[in-house]
C-alpha cells in the first residue's frame, strides 16, 4: 500500500507558503492505519524495545497502538504543566525561539530501550529534545520512528547516530 496516497496535502495551511501534510485522512482509513502501525512494529520487533515514547499530541495517535502491538508500555512526553507527577524537562529549539518538553521522572528506568514514535520529522528539534529527555532519564534511544519526513528541512541531520525510520518522505 502506498501510504503517501492516503495523506491529504493542503496548500497554504496553516499559513501562506506551507504545504500541510494532513494525517487525518490516513488515520480515518482503517486499512491504512493498520498498515502504518504494522510497518513501524516490523521495524521495531527485533530491537528489544521496553517502552514507546510519544510526543504530544500526534505521537500519541501512533505510539499507543505500536506499544500495544509490541506488548510494551507507552510514555507520553508533554508540554509544561500537563503531567501531574514530578517531571524532568528539556528545552529545545524551534524555528523562532525555544519550547520545553517534560517527562515523568520515574517513567523510564535506567537501561530501558526506548523507541520514539511520532507523526512527523521536520527540523528535528522536537525529537532531538525527546531523545535528550530519554537519555537524561537513563534510557537508551533504540529507534526514532516517523510516519512522515520532510526531507528538505534536514531534521534527520540532527539525529546522527540514531536509528531513524520514516515511512513517507516529502521534499516539501
UniProtKB/Swiss-Prot annotation:
Record-stated family: Belongs to the purine/pyrimidine phosphoribosyltransferase family.
Protein name per its UniProtKB record: Adenine phosphoribosyltransferase
Top-level division of the source organism's lineage: Bacteria
Protein encoded by which gene: apt
Complexes and interactors: Homodimer.
Subcellular location: Cytoplasm
Keyword vocabulary terms for this entry: Cytoplasm, Glycosyltransferase, Purine salvage, Transferase
Signal peptide interval: none
GO molecular function: adenine binding; adenine phosphoribosyltransferase activity; AMP binding
Protein species of origin: Clostridium beijerinckii (strain ATCC 51743 / NCIMB 8052)
Pathway: Purine metabolism; AMP biosynthesis via salvage pathway; AMP from adenine: step 1/1
Amino acid at each position: 500500500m502506498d501510504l503517501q496516497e492516503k495523506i491529504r496535502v493542503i496548500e497554504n495551511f496553516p499559513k501562506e507558503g506551507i504545504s500541510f501534510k494532513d494525517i487525518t485522512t490516513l488515520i480515518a482509513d482503517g486499512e491504512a492505519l493498520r498498515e502504518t502501525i504494522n510497518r513501524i512494529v516490523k521495524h521495531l520487533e527485533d530491537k528489544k524495545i521496553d517502552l514507546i515514547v510519544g510526543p504530544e499530541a500526534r505521537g500519541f495517535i501512533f505510539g499507543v497502538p505500536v506499544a500495544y502491538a509490541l506488548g510494551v508500555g507507552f510514555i507520553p512526553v508533554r508540554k509544561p504543566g500537563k503531567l501531574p507527577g514530578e517531571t524532568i524537562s528539556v528545552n529545545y529549539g524551534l524555528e523562532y525561539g525555544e519550547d520545553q518538553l517534560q517527562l515523568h521522572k520515574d517513567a523510564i528506568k535506567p537501561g530501558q530501550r526506548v523507541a520514539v514514535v511520532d507523526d512527523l520529522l521536520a527540523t528535528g528539534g522536537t525529537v532531538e529534545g525527546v531523545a535528550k529527555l530519554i537519555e537524561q532519564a537513563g534510557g537508551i534511544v533504540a529507534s526514532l520512528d516517523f510516519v512522515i519526513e520532510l526531507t528538505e528541512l534536514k531534521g534527520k541531520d540532527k539525529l546522527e547516530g540514531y536509528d531513524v525510520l520514516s515511512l513517507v518522505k516529502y521534499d516539501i
